[in-house]
Amino acid sequence: MSGREGGKKKPLKQPKKSNKDMDEDEIAFKQKQKEDQKKLDEMKGKAAQKGPLTGGGIKKSGKK
């Protein structure tokens, strides 16, 4: 038995599944996810413009 034969055998690669067999519900779900992601990105952009929300809390002096 040579050194190359030892170890775990790799399984044969499976062919990729085609995404052509999606029904209307899956297509609608994907479209809704894209729209939600766009809205989330817009909200992130607006939040970044306004600056941090903190600043009114208790401030620590840093001294001990």
Curated annotation (Swiss-Prot):
The alphabetical list of record keywords is:
Coiled coil
Q: Which residues form a coiled coil?
A: 21-50
SS bond partners? none
Listed Basic and acidic residues bias regions: 27-45
The source's superkingdom equals Eukaryota
Give positions of region: Disordered. Answer: 1-64
Regions of compositional bias (Gly residues) in chain numbering: 53-64
UniProt lists the family membership as follows: Belongs to the TMA7 family.
Protein name in UniProt? Translation machinery-associated protein 7
> What organism is this sequence from?
Xenopus tropicalis (Western clawed frog)
Q: Which gene encodes it?
A: tma7
